[in-house]
């Protein structure tokens, strides 16, 4: 999957609810952890939009119990034709307690499936230097480095924009955003500073992360700012 321009993913745990045509969105983030039988859903998917498969662990804000089955399913998803990219948590690749993601990373690489290596903080915003370290490590491990944090003030939001610009200007492919009320506006602003991937719910009221805009609203905001 190419990230020459900003791409917007519609997030859902139900591939049957995925947009039938690419209006306002460019791909579907399939939250496998929210689906009853995610691999069967991928096999049955016949939509035109490529899929970003995410099987988010419960320790990173998702619903999947940690363990080999979670990673096995993500690795199998990476081998599925409709899947263009997979999301693997940074912690699943580097932290001693949770580092079981290597199988999914290897499966993605073997099939030329794009890897998004992600780091989330649902409680706050690390320091600017800490965010730079997290994002830099994520970029070094995957094709795209994703960082999502929760600003507590406008200074935190500004730091998200700063780290986005720093790594984008250095030629890295990044996906960055602030979550929650104080970070919401960054979802529209970071694409101006080089963020290449954003997220929105398939339908209003079905957000998968705090502060998401509806797809049409987010695309309109980004277009107006550009």
UniProtKB/Swiss-Prot annotation:
Record-level Gene Ontology MF annotations: 3-dehydroquinate dehydratase activity
A Pfam family it matches: DHquinase_I
EC class (word): lyase
UniProt: 3-dehydroquinate binding residues: 29-31, 56, 187, 208, 212
InterPro entries for this protein: Aldolase_TIM, DHquinase_I, Type-I_3-dehydroquinase
Biological process annotations from GO: 3,4-dihydroxybenzoate biosynthetic process; amino acid biosynthetic process; aromatic amino acid family biosynthetic process; chorismate biosynthetic process
Annotated active site: 120, 146
Catalytic activity, EC: 4.2.1.10
Annotated CDD domains: DHQase_I
Catalytic activity: 3-dehydroquinate = 3-dehydroshikimate + H2O
UniProt keyword terms in alphabetical order: Amino-acid biosynthesis, Aromatic amino acid biosynthesis, Lyase, Schiff base
Signal peptide boundaries: none
Recorded metabolic or biological pathway in which this protein acts: Metabolic intermediate biosynthesis; chorismate biosynthesis; chorismate from D-erythrose 4-phosphate and phosphoenolpyruvate: step 3/7
Family as reported in the entry's similarity comment: Belongs to the type-I 3-dehydroquinase family.
PANTHER family in the record: 3-DEHYDROQUINATE DEHYDRATASE (PTHR43699:SF1)
Stated role: Involved in the third step of the chorismate pathway, which leads to the biosynthesis of aromatic amino acids. Catalyzes the cis-dehydration of 3-dehydroquinate (DHQ) and introduces the first double bond of the aromatic ring to yield 3-dehydroshikimate.
Quaternary structure (record): Homodimer.
Protein name as it appears in the record: 3-dehydroquinate dehydratase
Source organism: Halobacterium salinarum (strain ATCC 700922 / JCM 11081 / NRC-1)
């Amino acid at each position: 999957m190419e990230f020459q321009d900003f791409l917007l993913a519609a997030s859902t745990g139900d591939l049957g609810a995925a947009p039938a045509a690419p209006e306002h969105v460019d791909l579907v983030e399939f939250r496998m952890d929210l689906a009853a039988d995610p691999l069967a859903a991928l096999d049955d998917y016949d939509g035109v939009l490529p899929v970003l498969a995410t099987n988010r662990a419960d320790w990173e804000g998702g619903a999947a119990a940690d363990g080999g089955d979670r990673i096995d399913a993500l690795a199998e998803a990476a081998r599925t034709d409709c899947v263009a990219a997979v999301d693997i948590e940074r912690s699943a690749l580097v932290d001693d307690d949770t580092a079981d993601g290597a199988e999914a990373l290897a499966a993605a690489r073997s099939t030329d499936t794009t890897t998004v290596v992600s780091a989330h903080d649902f409680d706050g915003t690390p320091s600017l230097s800490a965010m730079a370290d997290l994002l830099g490590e994520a970029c070094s491990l995957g094709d795209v480095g994703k960082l999502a944090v929760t600003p507590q003030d406008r200074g935190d939001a500004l730091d998200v924009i700063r780290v986005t610009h720093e790594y984008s200007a250095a030629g890295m492919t990044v996906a960055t955003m602030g979550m929650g009320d104080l970070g919401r506006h960054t979802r529209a602003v970071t694409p101006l500073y080089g963020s290449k991937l954003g997220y929105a719910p398939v339908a209003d009221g079905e957000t998968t992360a705090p502060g998401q805009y509806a797809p049409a609203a987010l695309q309109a905001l980004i277009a107006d700012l550009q």
